[in-house]
A protein has these predicted regions:
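Active-site/acyl-donor-binding loops of N-acyltransferases
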Residues: 121-123, 133-153, 258-311
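Short, structured motif recognition centered on aromatic/hydrophobic residues
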Residues: 57, 80-85, 101-105, 143-145, ...
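A short beta-loop-alpha structural element at the N-terminal edge
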Residues: 2-25, 157-182
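Contiguous mid-protein beta-loop-alpha structural module that forms a pocket-lining wall or clamp
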Residues: 98-152, 166
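Conserved donor-binding loop and adjoining core beta-sheet/short helix segment
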Residues: 16-99, 211-241
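Structural motif
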Residues: 6, 69-70, 119-122, 212, ...
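Non-catalytic interaction/regulatory modules that flank or connect domains
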Residues: 183-217, 224-227
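Conserved acetyl-CoA-binding loop-helix of GNAT-fold acetyltransferases
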Residues: 92-106, 132, 238-252
Length: 311
């Protein structure tokens, strides 16, 4: 078995693999709304050959493809997300998955990538294999789904996000997310910005912040067409979070359903979504990150006088 980038000589095998329906173990935000499909192996390979920004690796045994993985850039070119992870060898599924992930890591190192992300079902074989391949668990995540029916009709303190809110939004992330998760993924504002996923939003979609006593305490992003949104709030900011949910409901009113992927550590967010009528779907997801550089220690922020607290 050989794991490598696809070659033009793999064309016949790629076409055959396209016809084999297998679960994509890499879960992206937009596929939570549209279904967890994946770029076809042939299309992904062509994108790589044409240098269109997608990286592709195949696991080959003889003339047959046993698995495929693809990765795409996030906000920054030096941050990648694995958006396809499919194995088609039931007898060696773990070996195929691990080889694909290790090949992705090698390619990321060669491209001077700093972060390689993977989201997969928590109970999937890929979650176990990711740990063996050197990925660190950032956080567990739950999917909320339904129709937002806020208990409040006011959205006091909520306004549209602007570029000037970037650092304040990063501080909300620092206060809302446990330090163990931040150490795995993003400890600086540059890292936090680099790993943000914008693929699930259209250009016309937006973001919100909510302020309390002159300070930003919650943030959200939303996609009107799919009804999907993110929600991050500081602990104890229940009232402000409810106001943020009210504003989201207004902007997503035309969507057939509303969905949000929220970290399991987000007690404030969970409570607000439950009050607004959303329900948690069965199962959970695990977000992993392979860091290819060491994070900046948080103590350096303290010396610089930047107020960042533990989550």
């Amino acid at each position: 078995m050989n794991t490598r980038a696809p070659r033009p000589t793999d064309l016949v095998a790629l076409v055959t693999f396209d016809e084999d329906v297998r679960e994509n173990l890499a879960v992206t935000r937009e596929r939570l709304a549209h279904g967890n499909t994946a770029p076809t192996p042939l299309a992904a390979a062509i994108e790589q050959w044409l240098h269109l920004g997608r990286r592709t690796w195949v696991s080959v045994a003889g003339r047959q493809i046993r698995g495929i993985a693809t990765a795409r850039e996030l906000t920054a070119k030096h941050a990648w997300e694995i958006d396809t992870l499919i194995e088609a060898d039931d007898s060696q599924s773990r070996e195929v998955l691990e080889d694909l992930l290790r090949q992705a890591i090698v390619a990321a190192e060669n491209a001077e990538v700093t972060h390689l992300l993977l989201r997969t079902p928590e109970e999937s074989e890929a979650a176990e294999v990711a740990m063996r391949a050197g990925f660190a668990l950032v956080q567990g995540e739950r999917l909320w789904r339904g129709r937002l029916q806020p208990t409040s009709t006011t959205a006091n303190g909520v306004r549209e996000w602007s570029d000037a809110d970037a650092f304040a939004s990063f501080q909300v992330y620092c206060r809302a997310v446990p330090i163990s998760a931040r150490q795995c993924m993003a400890m600086t504002v540059d890292e936090w910005s680099a790993v943000r996923d914008r693929h699930w939003q259209e250009r016309s979609d937006g973001a919100l912040v909510v302020e309390h006593e002159g300070r930003v305490v919650g943030t959200a992003r939303y996609a009107r067409a799919t009804g999907q949104f993110t929600l991050t709030a500081e602990p104890e900011a229940q009232g402000a979070t409810d106001a943020l949910v009210t504003a989201l409901a207004r902007r997503l009113g035309d969507a057939e359903r509303h969905i949000a992927l929220v970290a399991v550590s987000g007690a404030t967010e969970d409570a607000a979504l439950r009050r607004a009528g959303l329900e948690v779907e069965p199962g959970a997801y695990a977000l992993f990150c392979k860091r290819l550089v060491h994070p900046v220690r948080e103590e350096s922020y303290a010396r610089a006088g930047i107020p960042i607290t533990g989550g």
